[in-house]
Amino acid sequence: METTKKLSPIFCFSSLLCLFFTMNQAVSETDHMDTFCIDSSRNTTGNTTYNKNLNTMLSTFRNQSSIVNNYNLTTGLASDTVYGMFLCTGDVNITTCNNCVKNATIEIVKNCTNHREAIIYYIDCMVRYSDKFFLSTFEKKPNSIWSGDDPIPKSLGPFKKRLYKKMGEAIVRSSTLSSALTPYYYLDVTRFDGSYDLDSLVQCSPHLNPENCTICLEYALQEIIDCCSDKFWAMIFTPNCFVNYMITTSPLPPLPSPYHHSGSCSIRGNSEIFWGMIILAALVFTF
């Protein structure tokens, strides 16, 4: 005779909470993508005025990121002038932005000691500084590209063509948002074939004009199309813009293992994990 045991709701809920916080911590602790320390004959050594100005700037970024999701600053004079900026992705709240910028400003100094130019990419933000003015200049490099390992299902048909079309539409829309609260940020969710969603995000640095924003996003999209358009998700960060997409299923796709094209990164997983816990909880409590 078989006996069916039912878990108590309290035990189930406690287990789900433990699983959620464990997975959430794993994601949040590994969201650094890439750091680029630009080598130059202008690099400094020791406790210079330039380094002091840089530290002042990064401290200001940590404070300002608790208020706004993008900011730029110039500190110092003549050869000791530092130009810098931070930019958070438009889909994160101000707390997440602040945490990301705090981590980025600490890591960029730790990894790029005495460099007069550097850029660091996190999933939720980027921080950059230089001894040269760069804010309105369109630049393709250095960039960081990531994708999942899992291939998209054949049932989606000619996905590359469909992806190019939908992302192209998002880019056109983004270029009209230069005066938005989060300039040039656009997020789109499109249902494919009943059970698949295409989530696409595009965003430019607010200092670009609309023409250069479009050029940057089109370049970034082409990079993703060339390397990763057969994958469940992919993202690219450049000095001036971000592009990423993710295919999701109902209720959830398997969490993809990351494949890196130029650095180190993890998956943005908080929302997927959260909804996964909700769905699992609903199933458990029906028993």
Swiss-Prot record:
Main location: secreted
GO cellular component: extracellular region
Annotated signal peptide: 1-26
Ranges of residues in domain Gnk2-homologous: 32-134, 140-250
Glycosylation sites: N43, N47, N63, N72, N93, N103, N111, N212
Keywords noted in UniProt: Glycoprotein, Repeat, Secreted, Signal
Gene3D superfamilies in the cross-refs: Gnk2 domain, C-X8-C-X2-C motif
InterPro entries according to UniProt: GNK2 (IPR002902), GNK2_sf (IPR038408)
Subcellular location: Secreted
Taxonomic superkingdom: Eukaryota
Family according to the record: Belongs to the cysteine-rich repeat secretory protein family.
Protein name per Swiss-Prot or TrEMBL: Cysteine-rich repeat secretory protein 59
